[in-house]
């Protein structure tokens, strides 16, 4: 087979951002059939009183609707994806070392986006209505702990999951 079939869990942006600072999110574009057609990794996405926006330069901000689908890097790949990453890593490394060796990051969504553009992969987006809980900042921890406790009390997680 010449193409790969992958899966991604998509969340609503508004259910994934913190009140305590910026986050990185893969902003997704899908077609009418639930397939990913593009993904742009935005490394400075923030809530503000008027909604949610991102910036690339710290000066110019772009609003993003709260219901925009985003990737939280929950992917379903086949083993061939590792070969694709291995083939693409040298070019990334050359560029990262030249441009920003301290902060260079090989984003999985970039490789996926390249594969989609090359017509080598199809990604089905499985949408989740749930809120994403994560600790990006220390101030996020109390709400995450409370949410995990509530979901345990509701039976969504077994008591003693971490024992």
Predicted region positions:
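Conserved core of the sugar-phosphate nucleotidyltransferase
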Residues: 1-75, 79
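Residue-level signal for well-ordered alpha-helical positions
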Residues: 20, 42, 87-88, 147
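A generic structural signal for short hydrophobic patches within well-formed alpha-helices
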Residues: 77, 81-82, 141
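A C-terminal functional module that forms or caps the active site or interfaces directly
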Residues: 86-120
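Conserved active-site beta-strand element of glycosyltransferases/polysaccharide synthases
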Residues: 123-127, 134
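Short amphipathic alpha-helices within nucleic acid-binding modules
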Residues: 141-147
């Amino acid at each position: 087979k010449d193409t790969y079939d992958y899966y991604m869990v998509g969340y609503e942006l508004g259910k994934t951002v913190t009140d305590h600072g910026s986050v990185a999110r893969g902003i997704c574009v899908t077609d009418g059939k639930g397939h990913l057609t593009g993904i742009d990794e935005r490394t400075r996405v923030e809530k503000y009183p008027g909604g949610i926006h991102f910036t690339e330069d710290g000066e110019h901000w772009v609003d993003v609707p709260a219901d925009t689908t985003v990737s939280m890097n929950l992917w379903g790949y086949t083993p061939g994806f590792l070969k694709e990453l291995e083939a693409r890593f040298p070019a990334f490394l050359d560029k990262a070392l030249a441009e920003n060796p301290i902060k260079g990051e090989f984003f999985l969504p970039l490789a996926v986006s390249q594969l989609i553009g090359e017509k080598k992969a199809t990604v089905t987006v499985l949408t989740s209505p749930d809120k994403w809980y994560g600790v990006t900042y220390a101030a996020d921890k109390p709400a995450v702990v409370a949410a995990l406790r509530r979901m345990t009390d509701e039976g969504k997680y077994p008591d003693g999951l971490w024992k």
